[in-house]
């Protein structure tokens, strides 16, 4: 099959024209605006050595406009059984132009508050961390679609007035989650280490009364390389043993499946 006949008509192969799909099929636009901002403040507390607090706020707005305009691509096959030859017309894609437009806007916010402690007493080092975090996301969107345009004007109000060719939609939703976390650590002479941590998280995915879960973890460590009986092993510069255990949650699935 010819890509293009001598009279300028587009050829096709099994009903498709790659050239026509590239240059005559319409367009798709998705311009988007996104801003990621973060503000943090940290302060050492002078009345307790090694104690500090920190606050973080993230503000992330996002906006996207989508517009998809599909136009018919006429393709032709040559019928050599007739005299003179006849060109048989077909279409790739819709037989009349279609237009689909949508708009979505979202705002994501994250709030964090932290208190941190770290201090060494001789050979003993004690650390502690407490965190509270809240996240929220608000989303709005709307869409409109028109089929079977009789005029080649790519605007919603220029589309068909037949109810079967019209569809509109829109929705909005909110996402929320909150978490509390802690970590306590102890280190003796960089040889013996212990750490206990945990999270208490809540997420909007789950049914009221079952949205929160506690996830603990602990670890023990032994830095053998710092022991006196290892000092002469110059060919080994690091050797540690560690035992740890932890639990974590799972956000598999999607929101409101409990309904």
What are these regions (language model features)?
Residues 57-65, 132-138, 198-204, 224-226, ...:
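Transmembrane beta-strands of outer-membrane beta-barrel pores
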Residues 47-49, 122-124, 136, 190, ...:
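Short coil turns and loop connectors of transmembrane beta-barrels in diderm outer membranes
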Residues 1-16, 72-95, 138-168, 257-259:
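Surface-exposed loop/turn segments flanking beta-strands in extracellular/periplasmic regions
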Residues 161-181, 247, 259:
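Outer-membrane beta-barrel signature, preferentially recognizing the C-terminal barrel domain
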Residues 208-212:
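Short glycine/threonine-rich loop-to-helix capping motif typified by GTGT followed
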Residues 237-259:
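Surface-exposed extracellular loop regions of Gram-negative outer-membrane beta-barrel proteins
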Residues 185, 214-222:
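Feature captures outer-membrane beta-barrel proteins of Gram-negative bacteria and organelles
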Residues 15-68, 98-120, 127, 139-141, ...:
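Outer-membrane beta-barrel transmembrane strands
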């Amino acid at each position: 099959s010819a890509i293009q006949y001598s009279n300028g008509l587009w050829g096709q192969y099994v009903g498709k024209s790659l050239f026509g799909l590239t240059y005559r099929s319409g367009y798709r636009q998705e311009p988007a605006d996104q801003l990621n901002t973060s503000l943090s403040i940290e302060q050492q507390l002078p009345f307790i050595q090694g104690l500090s607090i920190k606050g973080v706020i993230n503000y992330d707005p996002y906006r996207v406009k989508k517009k998809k305009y599909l136009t018919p691509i006429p393709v032709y096959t040559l019928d050599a059984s007739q005299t003179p030859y006849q060109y048989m017309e077909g279409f790739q894609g819709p037989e009349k132009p279609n237009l689909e437009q949508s708009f979505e806007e979202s705002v994501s916010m994250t709030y964090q508050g932290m208190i941190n402690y770290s201090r060494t007493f001789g050979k003993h080092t004690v650390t502690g961390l407490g965190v509270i975090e809240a996240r929220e996301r608000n989303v709005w969107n709307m869409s409109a679609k028109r089929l079977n345009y009789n005029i080649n004007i790519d605007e919603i109000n220029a589309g068909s007035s037949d109810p079967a060719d019209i569809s509109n939609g829109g929705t909005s939703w909110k996402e929320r989650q909150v978490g509390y976390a802690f970590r306590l650590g102890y280190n003796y002479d960089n040889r013996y280490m212990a750490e206990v941590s945990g999270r208490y998280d809540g997420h909007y995915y789950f049914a009221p009364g079952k949205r929160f879960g506690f996830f603990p973890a602990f670890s023990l460590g032994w830095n053998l390389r710092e022991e006196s009986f290892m000092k002469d092993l110059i060919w080994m510069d690091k050797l540690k043993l560690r035992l740890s255990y932890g639990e974590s949650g799972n956000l598999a699935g999607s929101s409101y499946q409990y309904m």
